[in-house]
Amino acid sequence: MLASKLDPFFKRFEELNSLLSSSDILNDISKMTTLSKEQKNLEPIVLKAKEYLKTLDNIEENKALLNDPELGELAKEELKTLEELKPKLEEEIKILLLPKDPNDERNIFLEIRAGTGGDEASLFVGDLVKAYARYAENRGYKLEIVSSSEGSVGGFKEIIMLVKGTGAYSRLKYEGGTHRVQRVPQTESQGRVHTSAITVAVMPEVDDIEIEINPNDLKVDVMRSSGHGGQSVNTTDSAVRITHIPTGIVVVNQDGKSQHKNKESAMKVLKARLYEMQESERLAKESEARKSQVGSGDRSERIRTYNFPQNRISDHRINLTLYRLDAIMQDGLFDEIIEPLITHHQAQALQEQNL
């Protein structure tokens, strides 16, 4: 019974309240921060659980009044409302009880690269960047370009953006993978539909203490920044290329105005990539459980198709098709896809957890 599973959460919440009011904890900033975070995570469960248990009590009280000559009809109406509320609260609690993704509240690096399709792929990267920018604005996230390489006819061959905002990873993590686009290029005189592809990687921003990098493992090169078409954009060696020798990961940054700024940004991206690599290795060890979840975020996994002639967008992970591609791209309405993905993911997780 669900009610019996809630007792440990009440006990731990009360324990945390007591601990956070003790002088020993108040004098230990690190411990207080850790416990406060745990309390904050538990609070939604405790509040919803209290509402649920109160509903169960009210159901029993109204059942006892059904045969009352004066209050019977009123109790019957109230009971109907409560019986409808009960399963909704149970579902909400079950979702709250699911294991939390530790990265969900983090900022993210969004790395988008042109794949097959040449110039058309680069142009679509540019279109997707604009759509993501509108989505970020809709949700109150801040978006900044960390590094970019422009395409020869527009768009980007590659771009890395930092998306800042509470819960950015929890929603945009579903964007990781290969995105296929089908449309008639502007240069196509015969009106034929071309297919191209781009890849999206979603990497949580990590703290320095989470990823330690041995300076001896790095090869740092400085060079002159180059702009569109390769022309020099300044006369100082401000561009930075960092190679992580053990993994072969290379990060180039030239968008900042100073070498120091570019190196700082490149190091942040490198740490995010190393963290992503560690997470991928960890998840690979849990591959059986992973298979049942919505997408691995692997860049090689084709997750979505954008068909412009049909105004169609299809997410292949949950067989979702919407004929609203124009609105989704123009207004950044990705929640129309992300919300069903979250719902599907939660349903799979509930099944795995036997909740």
Swiss-Prot record:
The keyword Signal does not apply. Keywords: Cytoplasm, Methylation, Protein biosynthesis. Residues 280-303 are annotated as: Disordered. Gene3D superfamilies: 3.30.160.20, 3.30.70.1660, 6.10.140.1950. Residues 280-291 have a biased composition (Basic and acidic residues). One of its GO terms (molecular function) is translation release factor activity, codon specific. Methylated by PrmC. Methylation increases the termination efficiency of RF1. The modification N5-methylglutamine is found at residue 231. Its main location: cytoplasm. GO terms for cellular component: cytoplasm. Belongs to the prokaryotic/mitochondrial release factor family. PANTHER family: LD18447P (PTHR43804:SF7). This is Peptide chain release factor 1.
